[in-house]
Amino acid sequence: MSIRAQSRTYEHLDSARCDTKLKTMNILDKIITDKKREVELKKNIIPVSQLEASVLFNSRTYSLSKLLKNSVSGIIAEHKRRSPSKSVINNNHSVEDVVLGYQNAGVCGISVLTDAKYFGGSLDDLLLAKASVNIPLLRKEFIVNEYQILEAKAYGADVILLIAAVLTRKEIKQLSEFAQSLGLEVLLEVHNLEELEKSIMPSLDMIGVNNRNLKTFEVSLNYSKELASKIPDEFVKVSESGISSIEAV
């Protein structure tokens, strides 16, 4: 066998190994793998200094936690174009129309999906939302790096989401403290008791229970019911996902 032929064989085997690894990964693993790669690429294109020079970087932020505490509705609405579980959700209405409709309906805040590959969102969606409403905006993203928090601040977010399932306790502490140093609030998302217990710390403002299992995308409101009493009262408690009717509320 020639050296070239051997090289091709090894390349084919490496490719096969990668394909096998991807097939065994759940959707959350795939998203995080892609997200880490995406962040590194963006850091090479847009330096931190450019984000910090944004017009919105030093702008006033709104407190979602305070509004939730004093609200009649207690609702955080969401702008989402699509998802891995439901394909296309909103392909016809502009960001401006959607978020204005939410604000006029009396919601406390709006969650804006900014992941492009899996949810069809973008930071431009967050920017358009900022220009359209004057209520708190949550950047809903798979945050794994401080750079993404700087992006959130530069594009008009008031709140960031941290997902306990993809972060260690040390990472949650580092990222949440960094966000608060920029004047951003932090919503920490958990799905089970183990994630909750590893995550409780002073640098969080809100703790949410995701009713959707991010590894399988199965939904059950029982997750919120079971964990709500375990969340300390010092944190605003949020039930996330799977709420699609008045009865669910």
What are these regions (language model features)?
Residues 62, 120-138, 142, 173-188, ...:
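Alpha-helix-loop-beta-strand connector modules within alpha/beta enzyme cores
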Residues 1-2, 6-12, 16-19:
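A cross-taxon signal for low-complexity, glycine/charged-rich
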